[in-house]
């Protein structure tokens, strides 16, 4: 199905190096276990859902991490989170795609540790 094709392509876009990234297999394996029906339902839900009105209800300090090469979420979407979550902070990682935590794990872990301990 179209969902199968889409889901098989998605993990490549989550890494700057695509399927050549050392951690690509983690995401590729994860989507292999998704049924066609589940994949199709997920795509429909993502297309038709918006949680923007609910963002104002988030009161906790929130760290938003985004890779500047992410093709899953564009900057406008991430900026919407940052502008609508009162206590949020946006950190942008250069030369990273969707999986910042896998592409730059040391820098990501340092950032999260500092955020938690602030």
Features from the language model and the residues they span:
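Short beta-strand/loop motif that positions the catalytic acidic residue
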Residues: 58, 64-66, 70
């Amino acid at each position: 199905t179209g969902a199968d094709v889409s889901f098989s392509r998605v993990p490549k876009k989550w890494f700057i190096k695509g399927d050549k990234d050392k951690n690509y297999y983690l995401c590729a394996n994860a989507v292999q276990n998704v049924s066609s029906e589940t994949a199709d339902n997920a795509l429909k839900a993502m297309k038709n859902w918006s949680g923007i009105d609910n963002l104002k209800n988030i009161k906790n300090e929130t760290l938003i991490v985004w890779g500047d090469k992410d093709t899953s979420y564009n900057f406008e979407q991430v900026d919407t989170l940052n502008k609508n979550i009162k206590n949020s902070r946006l950190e942008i990682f250069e030369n990273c795609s969707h999986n910042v935590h896998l592409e730059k794990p040391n820098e990501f872990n340092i950032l999260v540790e500092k955020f938690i301990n602030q």
